[in-house]
């Protein structure tokens, strides 16, 4: 990093120029962010106000205020003084929308309370619908807008990698992205920027550019070859470490001379002893070192080996992305390439000395014949990545300023994802000229100048129109919105070419591009990011498994559990299947390890594939996924309320209200919990007046899943630890929903969701994907768009790929 020599008396010092340059960009950003978002129109028309006072309010007082009034506010909603100005009071608008929802669903008034007549229900629903529609129309020019959206960590990582072509952990120093209320990490309302964060972006840009843009002669190349004669292992010199079972490792050590930066190539020659009934071995290559008390390696790649023939594989990475030793320190100095067989069937290791290098002939092994290491790998000098930015030109040696301008004119449009103006380019050229005397070489000065590009709002934000009236986004904005939706990264050359020609906004071309993006492997980013955030899959890793209950649990299963749910989404998306498979399905996606966990036979290897499920497995759909069941458990047992809330929130977009303050948990409320079934505990909890109403609406959804334990295994008995042993009781999985529907077990719950709640699920999924696609929360102004998309979705038999295409072609996606 360059250390500037600053002087407060020097108005043209490099840091002064830097501050001036960045201030211009961030001031513009601030002005955009402060565009007025208020409207002089009132949300409630005079006639509407009269109707409310004369017809609506009396019904509320007679049927609703006892539970939603001054003395009691169930679900934290009070109706006797709820504002009727839905435009100016967003919270009131959302509460009225919730009232409309429960009225239409027949959930209110609840059983046991005086019911509304048909005419009374019509008065309420008509008034609320009209008030919401008027508020939407009055605020249409501003509602549903998120002018500024910063790239989140994933988007920044992918964008920097694609822009520079360099493998690096760009997001290493960035703070975590906070999820928005709807659970998404690409929501512009939650993605803020601090001064410290901007410093991290600058440091990251400098670090990356120092690796891409080089100067001076080519560095020396290090080449090593390792054979069976100089194999290392975990504990000392033994030839058995060349045959890799579950515990052995081939360690190729470079003690004295080794590179500390640059691209590397590792070539591994090996054979495999396959055991098809046990699954395939996994060849893992990692690079790092071994200090005295730690093992510090970072994985390069893992490959599933499906052939016993001798073969050679090559692996690539960058040295500086891996842990590096301090020269001359530690018991095991030097850089190490580690080769392992990561296969593990989760069976217990042999006892005693045999567990060091266990002889397990029934398991697959890998035999290493040789390992070659070379770094830095560079076919040309300067490297290709350097030449992509600082390209050959006669201007390079004749007119440095003109050459810099040409470089910026090529680099900035790719970074900003749009055409740039001469003014924008010349501002950076001026910056370069100002700082040039401070740097020994042109390359050094260009690194600093390009770093300024990479911390501009035009790069870090998805900037879209700030006009007071909504308008259709232009072709460049559409290209970015589409690529960040489906790839979580910048548009590629073809997408930008269609934007430049204007063809992208033609419906047939746009549809072709959506299909192309979905068929590209980069769409895995959409599958992974959306599925994780929609289903809250990240919670899986935060659940601590209670080893008293599950002593043999393999932590690698957590990754498999998450991948099952991601792979199911990917399978449904790729083949344009019905999204109702999320609710109930006759198949799932499994690898060998997760199949063994479920007790499903004849599934081998690490690769996930579609597996048909017999009905007695109860696994079909998300509610049979261990990811969902574990993330909504305690790590020792199921958690009925968490599972129920997850169903209501994630599948139906109907989250129950948060519990009132000072309400005890189940365990606190029931001191004799071990002697009670979960249903009995909940019934006792409902005996508390403050808890009864909410739990009547929540608990049944989770009780139906009680046949699944904490880690997603089927059970007929529930075990609880008592002293040094366990006590058991039969599973009770029968419950009655608020509408009187009785459910016994997960199969009846899934059938009910498909037959009676598929419309609610469809609307919920449309809302989630639309919100994710535009990077903002869904608001009342989106109500009409969601209704239209849901109708299309239903008419298309809930086909997921069609839904994505319809969203991209919708007015909501293409306007701002």
Report residues per predicted region.
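Secondary-structure capping and boundary motifs in well-ordered enzyme cores
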Residues: 52, 56, 91-95, 100, ...
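Bacterial N-terminal signal peptides
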Residues: 24-38
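Extended surface/linker regions that mediate inter-domain or inter-protein docking
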Residues: 127, 155, 159, 163-164, ...
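N-terminal secretory signal peptides that target proteins for export/translocation
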Residues: 1-23
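Extended, hydrophobic alpha-helical segments in both membrane/secreted and soluble proteins
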Residues: 408, 412, 424-428, 446, ...
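Sequence context surrounding c-type heme c attachment/ligation sites in exported
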Residues: 44-98, 105, 112-118, 361, ...
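Secretory-pathway/luminal and periplasmic proteins that interact with or process carbohydrate-rich
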Residues: 109-110, 133-137, 168-171, 182-183, ...
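Aromatic- and Gly/Pro-enriched helix-to-coil junctions and flexible linker segments
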Residues: 41-223, 338-394, 408, 413-430, ...
């Amino acid at each position: 990093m360059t250390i500037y020599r600053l002087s407060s008396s020097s108005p043209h010092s490099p840091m002064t120029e830097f501050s001036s340059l960045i201030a211009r960009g961030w001031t513009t950003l601030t002005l955009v962010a402060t565009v007025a978002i208020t409207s002089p129109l009132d949300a409630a028309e005079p006639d509407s106000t009269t109707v409310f006072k004369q017809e609506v309010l009396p019904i509320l007082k007679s049927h609703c205020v006892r539970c939603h009034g001054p003395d009691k506010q169930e679900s934290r909603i009070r109706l006797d003084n709820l504002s009727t100005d839905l435009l100016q009071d967003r919270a009131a608008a959302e509460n009225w929308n919730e009232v409309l929802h429960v009225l239409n669903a027949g959930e209110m008034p609840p059983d046991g309370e005086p019911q509304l007549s048909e005419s009374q229900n019509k008065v309420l629903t008509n008034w609320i619908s009209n008030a919401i529609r008027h508020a939407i129309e009055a605020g249409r020019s501003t509602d549903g807008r998120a002018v500024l959206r910063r790239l989140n960590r994933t988007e920044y990582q992918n964008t920097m990698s694609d822009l520079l072509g360099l493998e690096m952990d760009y997001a290493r120093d960035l703070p975590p992205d906070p999820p928005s209320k709807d659970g998404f990490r690409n929501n512009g309302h939650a993605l803020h920027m601090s001064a410290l964060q901007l410093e991290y972006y600058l440091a990251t840009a400098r670090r990356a550019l120092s690796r891409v843009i080089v100067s001076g002669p080519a560095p020396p190349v290090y080449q090593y070859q390792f054979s069976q004669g100089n194999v290392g292992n975990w504990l000392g010199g033994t030839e058995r470490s060349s045959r890799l079972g579950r515990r052995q490792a081939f360690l190729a050590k470079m003690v004295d001379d080794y590179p500390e930066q640059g691209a590397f190539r590792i070539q591994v020659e090996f054979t495999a002893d396959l055991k098809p009934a046990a699954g395939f071995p996994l060849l893992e290559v990692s690079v790092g070192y071994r200090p005295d008390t730690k093992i510090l390696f970072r994985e390069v790649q893992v490959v599933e080996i499906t052939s016993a023939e001798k073969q050679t594989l090559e692996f690539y990475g960058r040295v500086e992305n891996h842990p590096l030793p301090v020269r001359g320190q530690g018991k095991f100095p030097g850089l190490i390439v580690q080769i392992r067989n990561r296969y593990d069937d989760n069976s217990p290791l042999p006892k005693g000395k045999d567990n060091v290098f266990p002889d397990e002939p029934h398991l697959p092994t890998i035999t290493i014949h040789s390992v070659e290491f070379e770094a830095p790998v560079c076919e040309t000098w300067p490297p290709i990545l350097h030449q992509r930015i600082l390209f050959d030109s006669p201007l390079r040696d004749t007119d440095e300023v003109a050459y810099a301008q040409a470089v910026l004119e090529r680099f900035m449009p790719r970074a900003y994802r749009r055409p740039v103006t001469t003014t924008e380019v010349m501002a950076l050229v001026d910056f370069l000229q100002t700082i040039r005397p401070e740097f020994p070489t042109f390359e050094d000065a260009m690194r600093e100048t390009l770093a300024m590009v990479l911390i501009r709002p035009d790069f870090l934000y998805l900037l879209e129109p700030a006009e007071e009236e909504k308008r259709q986004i232009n072709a460049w904005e559409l290209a970015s919105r589409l690529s960040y939706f489906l790839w979580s990264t910048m548009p590629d050359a073809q997408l930008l070419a269609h934007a430049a020609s204007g063809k992208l906004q033609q419906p047939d071309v746009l549809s072709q591009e959506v299909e192309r993006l979905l068929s590209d492997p980069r769409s895995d980013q959409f599958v992974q990011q959306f599925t994780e955030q929609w289903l809250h899959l990240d919670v899986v890793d935060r659940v601590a498994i209670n080893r008293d209950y599950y002593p043999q649990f393999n932590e690698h299963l957590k990754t498999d559990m998450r991948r099952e749910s991601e792979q199911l989404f990917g399978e449904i998306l790729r083949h344009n299947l019905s999204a109702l498979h999320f609710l109930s399905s006759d198949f799932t996606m499994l690898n060998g390890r997760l199949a063994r966990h479920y007790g499903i036979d004849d599934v081998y290897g690490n690769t996930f594939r579609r597996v048909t499920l017999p009905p007695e497995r109860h696994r079909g759909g998300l509610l049979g996924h261990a990811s969902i069941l574990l993330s909504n458990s305690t790590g020792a047992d199921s958690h009925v309320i968490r599972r129920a809330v997850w169903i209501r929130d994630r599948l139906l977009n109907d989250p129950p209200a948060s519990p009132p303050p000072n309400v005890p948990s189940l365990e606190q409320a029931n001191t004799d919990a071990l002697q009670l079934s979960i249903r009995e505990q909940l019934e006792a909890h409902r005996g508390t007046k403050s808890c009864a109403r909410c739990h009547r609406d929540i608990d049944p959804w989770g009780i139906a899943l009680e046949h699944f334990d904490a880690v997603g295994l089927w059970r007929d008995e529930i075990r609880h630890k008592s002293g040094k042993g366990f006590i058991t009781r039969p599973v009770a999985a029968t419950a009655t929903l608020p509408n009187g529907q009785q459910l016994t077990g997960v199969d009846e719950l899934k059938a009910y969701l498909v037959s009676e709640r598929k419309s609610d699920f469809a609307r919920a999924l449309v809302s989630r994907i639309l919100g994710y696609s535009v990077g903002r929360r869904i608001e009342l102004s989106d109500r009409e768009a969601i209704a239209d998309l849901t109708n299309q979705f239903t008419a298309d038999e809930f086909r997921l790929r069609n839904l994505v295409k319809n969203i991209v072609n919708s007015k909501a996606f293409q306007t701002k």
